[in-house]
Amino acid sequence: MLQGMLQRTCLAVVSTAQTLIVRDKHAFNRAVLKPKVRCHFPKPMEVKRINVHGWNARMSTPEGRRVLMNRILKGRHNLSH
């Protein structure tokens, strides 16, 4: 009985650790965070939206990186367009 409890506890700890490792791998992977592209992309205004508010635009300036960090700290799932 004690051995069974220990095995279940160890399995629970291992599965929790595996879940945490998987989540850490995907924390900033854009393909996992935002997997779908809009169906009729690129419409002209969507191109402008991506160019102005997109990931590359945010990462290219210090203020944009500050915006992304604030969104990360706030717990947003979608960091940028």
Curated annotation (Swiss-Prot):
Disulfide bonds: none annotated. Keywords: Mitochondrion, Ribonucleoprotein, Ribosomal protein, Transit peptide. Pfam families: Ribosomal_L34. GO terms for cellular component: mitochondrial large ribosomal subunit. GO terms for biological process: mitochondrial translation. Its main location: mitochondrion. Component of the mitochondrial ribosome large subunit (39S) which comprises a 16S rRNA and about 50 distinct proteins. This is Large ribosomal subunit protein bL34m. It comes from Drosophila melanogaster. The lineage of its organism: Eukaryota, Metazoa, Ecdysozoa, Arthropoda, Hexapoda.
